[in-house]
Each structure stands twice: as C-alpha cells, then as structure tokens.
Amino acid sequence: EPYRRQRQMCIRDRYEGRAHSILEYTDQAFVLNGFSKRFAMTGLRLGYLIAPKSCMRSLQKLQQNLFICASSVAQQAGIAALRQAEPDVERMKQVYDERRRYMIARLREMGFEIKVEPQGAFYIFADAHKFTTDSYRFAFDVLEHAHVGITPGVDFGTGGEGYVRFSYANSLENIREGLDRISRYLSRPGS
C-alpha cells in the first residue's frame, strides 16, 4: 500500500510461478538487472538498464562518465544467454529450489530461526540469537572450528546483529557436508 501511494512497485525473482516484469504495468519504469545470478555469469560484470525513452540521453551521459564498458567476451556471453539460456535458467531454478528447501529444513533442525524464507537469489538470512549475540564472532568461530564460511548479519547493518547469512550456491553434497560440520560444532560442549 505505501508503494501505491508513491506510485512505486517492486517485483522480484521467485522460485514458483511465472516471472513478472514491471514493464507489464507501465512504460515509465526503470529496470536495473544483471546476468550474474540469472545466467550464472558471476565475474563478467554484465548488467543492463531499461528506462523510459525520455531519460535515456541523461542516463547515457552518466554511464559514459562512470563506467568504461563490459568486455566483448561478457557482451557476447550475454547475447548468447538471452537467446539460448532460458531452459538452463529453469533447470537452475529447480536445482536452487531443492538446495533452498534442504538448507531451510536443516537450519531449522539445528535451531536457527528463519523468519522469512527466501524466494529468489541463493541466500538464507537466519536468526542465530539462540547461539550468539555477536554475529561477527559467531561467523569467525564457525569458520575456525567447522571450516565453513558464513556471513555475519552485522555486515548488513546493525539490524542484522544476531543473524547470519548462508549461501546455497554450491552443490547439494557440499551443502550437506557444510551443514553437518556446523551441526557437529554447535553440539560440542561450550560452543
């Protein structure tokens, strides 16, 4: 409702249902996106902006003064992704959804609270207050003792303290192993 009053709308990627675009609703929208997650093209630093025609020249001036350009390799890969990769994207979504569901269940079994289940991307922001009030120290201890990297919630601002972020952008086998290690670490006396 607050977004409607300000004539704003937010649409995000989801695992279920048809993908939507703000451009279905208006031609006065700005769409900023990249190829990293959707097409698994991390590191190529390729993105795009769709904007109203009336804003294009100003945006071109801004772009020309802030960025050099995407490499020709990244540009060609992006073109190929747009033309051919949709079946692969759908398969990846199914794989990520399987990993997401598995990780959510395991984290809850271990005692982490997940207040909002992720619907896109490949991260879970879990409440770790049961284990710590210092997410930085907790993430460091998990790395040192379980040899698994997680991100302290405080890295996302003070409101993230007591939370940690897990990634499921790895194989299910490695996710299982990592969660097994964390589980063993948490069940040790004094952890």
Regions found by a protein language model. Give the residues of each.
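Active-site pre-lysine segment of PLP-dependent enzymes
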Residues: 12-41, 53-54
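PLP-dependent enzyme catalytic core of the Aspartate aminotransferase-like
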Residues: 132-134, 141-151, 156-191
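Short helix-loop capping/hinge motifs at secondary-structure junctions, enriched
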Residues: 40, 53-58, 87-88, 131-132
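Structural signature of PLP-dependent enzymes
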Residues: 59-63, 81-105
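Short beta-strand-to-turn element immediately C-terminal to the catalytic PLP-Schiff-base lysine
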Residues: 23-24, 46-53, 83
